[in-house]
């Protein structure tokens, strides 16, 4: 009986090790978030500066990447006053379609909270411009300033609305908003774009219209409240206050 018990314990022990190993392989090899987190360890990518990586066979000019990132950082620094996210943010530039599929996006930011908070930005050459980089870095900065609990509770329209403040593309301009909403007569209610499932659903035009509304609404809030109130809002959210109560006051 003692021998059988030892065998059972050993079997369970090794089964757990195999299970953990299998989960780790799945996460880092087949899950986009895990794949991004492990880019620094992959032979398919190379580091070109601190926390900036490109696929090894990248056909573009690496100096152009550095210049665009510097411009985006300057834009975001002007907005926030300073950036605290850079040490915990990885930027991945990729022009390989197969690798982009593994990264799970060609112009987006994924933020993980465990074991430490870290944002991984993936951008393809199609979207490699200062507006997209500034947009994604704004996500990373906002996520860095918010606690994990507060980050999970903010609505998607607010997250995107803040990021769009540093995205100057014409498709999200105030003139475009006025034209497409008939000067605000036809807009999207906040409660209809609270979640990612709501915000990113539908056609490209549907999503773009929500982006447009999110930018306009957050722009108006910032004009009425200013940067200091925005920073106070972050503090209040980190303190556990309900988003709608804090944002509406």
Annotate each PLM feature.
Residues 45-62:
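Acidic/histidine-rich, surface-exposed loop or edge segments in extracytoplasmic proteins
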Residues 132, 150-216, 222-249:
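Acidic/His/Gly-enriched intrinsically disordered linker/tail segments
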Residues 1-21:
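N-terminal Sec-pathway targeting helices
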Residues 64-117:
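Auxiliary, metal-adjacent structural segments of Zn-dependent hydrolase domains
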Residues 43-47, 109-116, 124:
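Short, exposed beta-strand/loop patches in secreted or surface proteins that constitute
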Residues 18-40:
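Membrane-interface motif at the C-terminal end of an N-terminal transmembrane signal
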Residues 117-133, 148-154:
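Short pre-active-site segment immediately N-terminal to the catalytic Zn-binding motif
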Residues 138-146, 167:
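Active-site-flanking alpha-helical
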């Amino acid at each position: 009986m003692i021998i059988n018990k030892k065998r059972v314990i050993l079997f369970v022990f090794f089964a757990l090790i195999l299970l953990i190993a299998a989960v780790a392989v799945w996460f880092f090899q087949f899950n986009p978030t895990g794949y991004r987190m492990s880019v620094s360890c992959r032979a398919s990518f190379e580091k070109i500066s601190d926390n900036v990586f490109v696929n090894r066979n990248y056909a573009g000019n690496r100096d152009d990447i550095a210049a665009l990132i510097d411009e985006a950082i300057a834009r975001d620094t002007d907005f926030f006053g300073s950036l605290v996210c850079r040490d915990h943010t990885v930027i991945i530039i990729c022009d390989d379609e197969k690798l982009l599929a593994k990264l799970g996006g060609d112009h987006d930011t994924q933020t993980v909270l465990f074991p430490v908070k870290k944002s991984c930005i993936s951008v393809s050459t199609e979207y490699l411009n200062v507006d997209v980089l500034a947009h994604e870095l704004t996500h990373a900065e906002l996520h860095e300033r918010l606690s994990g609990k507060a980050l999970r509770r903010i609505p998607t329209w607010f997250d995107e609305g803040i990021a769009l403040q540093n995205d100057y593309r014409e498709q999200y301009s105030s003139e475009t908003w006025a034209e497409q909403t008939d000067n605000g007569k036809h807009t999207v209610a906040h409660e209809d774009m609270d979640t990612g499932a709501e915000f990113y659903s539908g056609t490209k035009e549907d999503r773009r219209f929500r982006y447009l509304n999110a930018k306009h609404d957050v722009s108006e809030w910032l004009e009425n409240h200013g940067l200091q109130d925005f920073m106070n809002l972050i503090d209040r959210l980190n303190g556990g206050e309900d988003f709608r109560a804090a944002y509406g006051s």
